[in-house]
């Protein structure tokens, strides 16, 4: 089953199970138990107060080295440019799922540990920003998107995103 044929979560799960049978060498990206991220205290306080639900990081070499599963990426690259490319790139995801994010400053004088509900990457396009708006109520990229659209920029940046869940531990005070 491909993207155009899938309308429900059940259909996706069935298609994904078929995909895994067809490609037994495929392995899900290895999860990251705890991801350390440097953050300014004001943003950590916004998360603690429930005002900020999303965190973004540039799709840079630094974060790709930390967040991209090399084995899954190699599997996907094997099918790049083949007749199986669409199917493989639809089901396979090389972004390593993060379980907990440990936000802190450079000196580690404070920390904020939060559950990561979901992480992946987005492109600064109308569709991806609309997804963030509707799925998470996140409007942090709206102004940047409008600026790129006004300038008719074709090369759009990518970002890793993290949906922040419940606070697990912190030494910050409200």
Regions found by a protein language model. Give the residues of each.
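Structured alpha/beta reader/binder surfaces that contact nucleic acids or chromatin modification marks
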Residues: 2-174
């Amino acid at each position: 089953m491909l993207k155009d044929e899938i309308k429900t979560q059940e259909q996706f799960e069935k298609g994904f199970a078929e995909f895994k049978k067809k490609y037994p060498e495929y392995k899900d990206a290895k999860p990251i138990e705890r991801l350390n991220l440097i953050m300014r205290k004001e943003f950590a306080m916004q998360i603690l107060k429930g005002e900020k639900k999303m965190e973004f990081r540039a799709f840079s070499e630094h974060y790709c080295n930390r967040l991209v599963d090399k084995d899954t990426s190699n599997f996907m690259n094997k099918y790049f440019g083949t007749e199986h490319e669409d199917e493989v790139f639809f089901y396979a995801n090389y972004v390593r799922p993060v379980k907990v994010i440990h936000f802190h400053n450079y000196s580690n004088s404070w920390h904020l540990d939060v559950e990561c509900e979901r992480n992946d990457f987005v492109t600064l396009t109308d569709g991806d920003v609309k997804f963030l708006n509707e799925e998470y109520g996140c409007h942090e990229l709206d102004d940047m998107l409008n600026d790129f659209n006004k300038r008719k920029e074709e090369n759009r940046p990518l970002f890793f995103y993290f949906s922040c869940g419940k606070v697990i531990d912190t030494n910050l005070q409200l």
